[in-house]
Amino acid sequence: CTPSRAACITGRYAVRSGMYNIGMLRESHGMRGEEVTLAEVLSKVGYATAFHGKWHLGDIEESYPHNQGFDEAFFTGYNQILSLNSKKAELANASIGLHEDLLPEDPYKLDDTFVTKGWVQIAEGTKGGPTRQWGDNSHETYMKSDPEAQRRTLEFIERNAKAGKPFYVANCPNMTSFIPNPKTVSTAPSILQDGLE
């Protein structure tokens, strides 16, 4: 996930950008600011750029999409829903072997608003502007992220097409590309696993 995203956005092998591992919660790691991204190159020649969806290229300010050349960004910084990474979720078999006791100590905060357990599920920002949390860290908010990313993507396309401005937009959904039939019986414990089957 992280390595292929880094390769697509930089045009370089992930090992060269240092993004060769799958990023996990609150690592205080991410793509370095000096990496040249597709968005930066396109911005230099007059394109409007946007990123909406799963970013998964780090949880440090310099790695955020709007700090990597995108004019606007609406993104999740991690892999899937963070609220599953808890002891309670592990006891319910929603996650295996990952809970907050395994995470590094980290004084990380996104802006002047502290959030539950120090991490942010969904953020938004504009080039040169502040990063802000969108919604809360609940499952309900997470389930709204893909429709919101789609809405923003369509609005970005319409706005730039109307202005006659060239644009590049990346929309990377957090969930699988289809929702399984609700009438289908499955042994998978989650909708994500159903989609992957």
Briefly describe each language-model feature range.
Residues 1-197:
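Formylglycine-dependent sulfatase
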